[in-house]
C-alpha cells in the first residue's frame, strides 16, 4: 500500500511536470483541480506512504530505503528538465533508471536494506534497471503508435519528452540537424506554430527507429 501510494503520487506530480490533461484515459488531477491542488495532493500522498511504514513496527526498517527511493525519484525527474538538448540513448537510459528504477525495485530491496552491497543485491538491482528500461520502452512505443493512429505527431515529440524511439532517431542525425531538437530555455515543447514538428514527425515515421526500438525490446 505504501509503495502504491508513492507510485500514484509520482504520477500526479508527473502530470503536473508534463502538463498532461489525462492519465490512463481519465482527466488528470492537475487538469481537473489545478496544478496547485495536484502538487499538494502528491505531497500528501508521499507523506502518507511514509506514515504507513512508520506505524507498522514490522516494516519500520524499510523507511530508509523508502526515503532514499523518494530522493532518487525526485532527482531523476528533475534531471529530465535540466538539459536543453534531446537526450542521447545513453542519457535516455540514465534518465529512465533515475525516475523509474527506484520505485520498481523498492518493494523487494526494502525487505533487506542492510544487504545492499552483496553480489546478489547487485544482480537484483541490475534486473530492476533492465526491467525499468523495458517498461519505459513499451510506453514509448505505445506513445508513437498512438500518434500514428491519430495521424498526428506523438505527444512525446510535441513536448520533447525523452522517448526511446525518438532517442534512437536523434542518435542517427547529423550534428547540424540535432540542433533542431534543442529545447527552449524553459526546457519545454515545440511552439504550436513550429513547422519543424510535422517535418520531424514524418522523418521519424520514415526512419527505421521504431523497428529498431521494437527489436531492442525483444532482446
Q: Could you describe each region identified by the protein language model?
A:
Residues 1-219:
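All-alpha prenyltransferase/terpene-synthase fold signal
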Amino acid at each position: 500500500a505504501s509503495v502504491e501510494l508513492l507510485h500514484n503520487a509520482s504520477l500526479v506530480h508527473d502530470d503536473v511536470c508534463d502538463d498532461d490533461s489525462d492519465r490512463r484515459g481519465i482527466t488528470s488531477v492537475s487538469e481537473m483541480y489545478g496544478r496547485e491542488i495536484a502538487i499538494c495532493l502528491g505531497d500528501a500522498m508521499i507523506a502518507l506512504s511514509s506514515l504507513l511504514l512508520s506505524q507498522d513496527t514490522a516494516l519500520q526498517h524499510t523507511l530508509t530505503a523508502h526515503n532514499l527511493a523518494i530522493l532518487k525519484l525526485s532527482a531523476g525527474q528533475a534531471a529530465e528538465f535540466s538539459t536543453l538538448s534531446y537526450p542521447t540513448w545513453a542519457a535516455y537510459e540514465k534518465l529512465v533508471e533515475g525516475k523509474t528504477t527506484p520505485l520498481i525495485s523498492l518493494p523487494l530491496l526494502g525487505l533487506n536494506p542492510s544487504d545492499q552491497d552483496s553480489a546478489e543485491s547487485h544482480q537484483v538491482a541490475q534486473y530492476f534497471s533492465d526491467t525499468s528500461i523495458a517498461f519505459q520502452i513499451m510506453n514509448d512505443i505505445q506513445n508513437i503508435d498512438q500518434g500514428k493512429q491519430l495521424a498526428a505527431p506523438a505527444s512525446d515529440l510535441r513536448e520533447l519528452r525523452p522517448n526511446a524511439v525518438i532517442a534512437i532517431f536523434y542518435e542517427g542525425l547529423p550534428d547540424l540537424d540535432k540542433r533542431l531538437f534543442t529545447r527552449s530555455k524553459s526546457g519545454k515543447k515545440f511552439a504550436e506554430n513550429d513547422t519543424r514538428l510535422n517535418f520531424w514527425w514524418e522523418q521519424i515515421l520514415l526512419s527505421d527507429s521504431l523497428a529498431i526500438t521494437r527489436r531492442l525490446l525483444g532482446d
